[in-house]
From Swiss-Prot:
Top-level taxonomic group: Bacteria
Native species: Rhizobium johnstonii (strain DSM 114642 / LMG 32736 / 3841) (Rhizobium leguminosarum bv. viciae)
Keyword Ion transport: no
A Pfam entry, by short name: ABC_tran
Source lineage: Bacteria, Pseudomonadati, Pseudomonadota, Alphaproteobacteria, Hyphomicrobiales
Record SUPFAM superfamilies: P-loop containing nucleoside triphosphate hydrolases
Keyword Lipid biosynthesis: no
Protein residues bound to ATP: G54, E55, N56, G57, A58, G59, K60, S61
Subunit structure: The complex is composed of an ATP-binding protein (RbsA), two transmembrane proteins (RbsC) and a solute-binding protein (RbsB).
Protein name (record): Ribose import ATP-binding protein RbsA 2
Keyword terms: ATP-binding, Cell inner membrane, Cell membrane, Membrane, Nucleotide-binding, Plasmid, Repeat, Sugar transport, Translocase, Transport
Amino acid sequence: MMNAAFQQTATDSKTGDAPAILEMRGISQIFPGVKALDNVSIALHPGTVTALIGENGAGKSTLVKILTGIYRPNEGEILVDGQPVTFASAQAAIDAGVTAIHQETVLFDELTVAENIFLGHAPRTRLRTIDWQAMNSRAKALLTALESNIDPTIRLKDFSIAQRHLVAIARALSIEARIVIMDEPTAALSRKEIDDLFRIVRGLKEKGKAILFISHKFDEVYEIADDFVVFRDGRAVGQGRLKETPQDEIVRMMVGRDVENAFPKVDVAFGGPVLEIRNYSHRTEFRDISFTLRQGEILGIYGLIGAGRSELSQSLFGITRPLSGKMMLEGREITIHSPQDAIRAGIVYVPEERGRHGLALPMPIFQNMTLPSLTRTSRRGFLRAAEEFALARKYAERLDLRAAALSVPVGTLSGGNQQKVVIGKWLATAPKVIILDEPTKGIDIGSKAAVHGFISELAAEGLSIIMVSSELPEIIGMSDRVLVMKEGLAAGIFERAELSPEALVRAATGNA
């Protein structure tokens, strides 16, 4: 259904009988050169999970920033319990009962669990000092309600992503949030961790919370959400009940077309060996790994969480050092002690957590894209802005980067466009080997097909690619061969003709 019909019914056709907790009516957000949101109306109801679906750049992130008080819309109004409100700051949104749990949780490693939960609203004694005993006790009660035995007095620095999400949810409960926004919460979770998260979400529903669930994973959307809203090009183009709407229809709403070939793999005539790894071992994470990567080949690496896939990739890039083993690049033995060594050798790495490890978020797009290539854009120690812009523009156009300008901070981009910046900055160095760690994590279905197509193009041009992925369709659809890892060991290398979900899962789990 199209936007006009949706706008008329968005606030009164939702599933629940209860009035909406929060409504957005006619919201528009305008930035220089782009209308990020165009006359958007949505309603969130108590005890209901509403999935917000759309391609990267569709306006989802802008909507979340408005709801959390980071942006103030140019047009439209927000109502809470039927009363107009203005979120002039993040604190104003929190005071109104709105909280967000992001894909990369905003928590502080050096603070304890309890301190993170009650940051900014810690219980006080009569003397107005922090009541540490009460804070730890309340944090423990919140965690127990979430069926967690996490010690609230320990620091967060060694916590897994799943544990961080749990702390973020406990924080939401501590401020008595009524509207909970979950932005790609399952992106780095195992299936068991996803099941645990969904159990908590269902508990929040029972407590009457209104939940806005943002995800690109349709199986999870259909599992946990009741309703959906689809964004495209800054507009809300469709809404309804998930159980009444086929997935293909939602995809058509998202992209305005049918997406037929999600894995546009190109057959490539491989060249000779480019990277050879022999008996590579790490002190704790992986042991005795060997493989050969040929020119133009896409080598997939698959395994369960904790199998050592990312750790192996990071070691190849020099983030960590191997305990033993040999690395050969184009027939010559090399030693990689640091990422700088790897870059000089022609090996680059696109990390899983792009926001934390791949980008300088406050810096402009063009500077992020040219950081590893400063020797090409400087003369006698002085940077040449025109050359920086020209280099950044070249790869921005090649990757179809969607941004108002190359001078805007990269942190203002959607997740998919941020990923394009990371890939572009490494392509600008003319590498021989590129390692892609979860390259489509947090990317929508339409953009995934585009990224897959670009990966295939790079392979056809002779670039050698290592692709780490936890998504079986991606591994099978894009790889020429697959190295399966299990508990730090190589469980097998499969040729393309041998690839099947059953074979890879059996190898990854040890159930031969």
